[in-house]
């Protein structure tokens, strides 16, 4: 009887494991036509029923610990980092920095410059103001973990300093946010800043209304707070109207009080075939309403950037504006063939998964993940251009220019950037300027170990609420009990 019980338990365990593995590897779309809408999970529940919808979405909610993860390992990594990081160098570099009263960060929807991957021949320049902006500005490209969609992954990387490298197909806001999260928001609020989020669309998209509460924003201005008469293109709030709302919000704050606003725009969102939108820019030698509309939207976006910068040039309070794109646009394959002249994979799914483009090196592939970014101030700051960074580093990098206090995690990220200047799910840029895939046989072992340690810290902050090393992620070292 004992033997039979053991065999029964083994069989039950094997069946459970087999069912779990089959579930986790099941393609619900291919097998059953069930599409998991992580942008709006409630839509999946409504469309397929609560049971089927939840089952389809739930597979994305499991994140396993990285290799070697433990509370002691996190403590050891944090302790080593605090001993070895170049904290004193950072403080010396920032000694003469102006501390901005206002920090405005804008993630510009589908903002991409095709000149980084090819030579688009357009009837006129689509980024003339940005090209002319050369004083008190740092410009370059920031590497993201997504293309054509997945906006919330890029904003998560910027706000938290964590990377979506381990879960490029998942969205932390939707899958993993169950408790308070440390971020740029908490770092600035601990230093007296008011923190406002803005997005001219539904607050529930990507579960932002919940995510922003866990990130500790004081207020969230969504589409409901925009006027019905606000300028729209293709039914979406224009960047001009969006930035006017930023100015209005700034003007309503207490003069001199520290102010942080994080904005996610909507104007340039796909698709680009609206028959009521008048395109002003044409692609020479390429007849495409989609490409013409996209580049025309970029030009309108550039004009709105000009408005915002020129406004804050006249403001007395020291102000920093950070802008970056969330991902390249979802635009037709034929145009890409025209721009780069090389074959692309057949399915959009392979792009998102990061599968290798045919005939493209890893360095060329990464260019499709590199969106524009700039950091501008209305006070004197050393200008730089052609900077390569990744979005997980960007907020720490911006903070390092302000003279504000940094968390140990900020300092860790700045130190990691010295070793690995840019990284995403596909690969990384080494300190010697060489690009590697994570599974390349010649990828430096030291860099792979740095990345493993980074994953341990991220897992601790994002998932391990019970054993989270709160002091490493805050300037105050106080534990958040939420």
List where the protein language model places each region.
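Solvent-exposed soluble domains appended to multi-pass membrane proteins
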Residues: 88-101, 105-108, 113-482
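N-terminal secretory/membrane-targeting segments
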Residues: 1-101, 121-141, 173-182, 299, ...
